[in-house]
Amino acid sequence: MSVTSTSLNGTFNGISEDGIEIFKGIKYANIPYRWAYAERIDDYDNGVFDCTQEGMACPQVLPFDYNIEKGPKEMPFDEFECSNLMITRPQGATNLPVFVWIHGGGNLAGNGYCSDHNPVPFVKHSIVAGRPVLHVMIEYRLSAFGYLAVPDTNGNWVGNWGARDQYTALQWISKHIVEFGGDPSQITIGGESAGSIGLHALMVHESMKPKEECIIHNVILSSGTMDRMGTGTISENAFKPIYDGIKTLVGDINTCSADELLEAQIKAGLDLGFYLQDDFFPPDWRNVRFKVSRVLLSDVIVDGTNFKNKINPAVRVTPENDFDHKVFKLYNISTEDTWEDYHYKMMLFKGDETFIRGNQQLELLFEQENIPVWRQLFDQIHPNDPSRLCHHAVDLYYMWDNWEMPEDKHAVARQYQDTLTKFVYGQDPWPVDKLHYVHDNQFEILDKSQFGDFRNVPALKFLLGFSAEELGELTKKYTGEGHYTL
């Protein structure tokens, strides 16, 4: 099964299985050298390409504990070949709505070919539901390869390589997806955690463009905004100390091996992929006017589970200032709490402070601009282990539906996929003036005034009274050494 494109000047041979066609490892850009801007490919020089094998992922360490049974898939890594994408479509697709997915992983790790992101069940169910969707997954540069700021030949600091890759991929999709049966006028882009943060970053980037030039219109943001990741100058985000630390360890950062660079970034303290305030973003990026048309905004009640290993007995907090005392009061934390109770309450706090606060900020901005927002609370617990609660990224189990789990959980997954495909089709997944609450195998449509029944509104209001920078300083002592958990 193949696609021969005159406009792309190439032939792409894919896989056809059980009514689904898959094209893997399509390069959307060339990366000429380390820390170079990706160069979009629009002409494939009359080549014939084997798209039956998984594409390369960006080299990465795995400093995370994964909240998924299947775990990170062993992948071939190549920093110069990771600018690729995978297209999954119904057989014979023509003019279908497109759903693009940006994977998470803290901008340090992850890949779209990982078995937990397999889109085949999603696409199959979209056919059954009568809303067939063409799905695209994108790879992009990660960790130091994607988010280290480096000085150029003029001494100016440049970065955001991974974010620029993501935008280049979206440009390729907008321009060329019609060759694979997608409708370029109906593209929805989604992401979870760092994927959602990245999508927010791309929306900020497009705020600098005239609306007619924008390619991001319909978005699904799940548990991640730029709010606490932010952008910064060299000193504010500590890029230069990290750069200097890596350079001290490896010598020439441009010619050292990928493995040497990865080992050095850990020792130098690069534990998340931050954004650089350069020409990719407007100076006042927190107060832009978004150009998107429709938004589905979602989070999870215990989004703070990705801090669970960083909240440890060695950093148990004793209230010392007004901020601490207020946090303890708002989350009903006591110095007499058992470790289990303290740990759970701190995860609630970190989830609010890191993720849900940002969603609340974005929702207010969207509403001020009359951009419709479908607000969702995804509080469905882990499908196989209730003790893991409704943790950060738990919605991915139900989005992709490719794990072994009880049939009632598969039913929840199918209903959730219905919700998402309706949004992708430009339909209302639920009334836009209502709240969508997913819990205990139920999909409830509630009045938005009931938001406070399921989220800590007094705490969110308190946290919104501080800037992200202030929160960064005030909450440093609340977490310690340890891996993030995805």
Curated annotation (Swiss-Prot):
Residues at the active site: 193, 303, 392
Glycosylation sites: 332
Reactions that this protein is recorded to catalyse: a triacylglycerol + H2O = a diacylglycerol + a fatty acid + H(+)
InterPro entries listed in its UniProt record: AB_hydrolase_fold, CarbesteraseB, Carboxylesterase_B_AS
Domain of life: Eukaryota
Keyword line: Disulfide bond, Glycoprotein, Hydrolase, Lipid degradation, Lipid metabolism, Signal
Disulfide feature: 58-82
Gene3D superfamilies, alphabetized: alpha/beta hydrolase
Gene Ontology MF, one: triacylglycerol lipase activity
EC number: 3.1.1.3
UniProt cross-references to Pfam families, sorted A to Z: COesterase
A GO biological-process term: lipid catabolic process
Protein family according to the UniProt entry: Belongs to the type-B carboxylesterase/lipase family.
PANTHER family: CARBOXYLIC ESTER HYDROLASE (PTHR43142:SF1)
Protein name as catalogued: Lipase 1
Species classification: Eukaryota, Fungi, Dikarya, Ascomycota, Saccharomycotina
Record gene name: LIP1
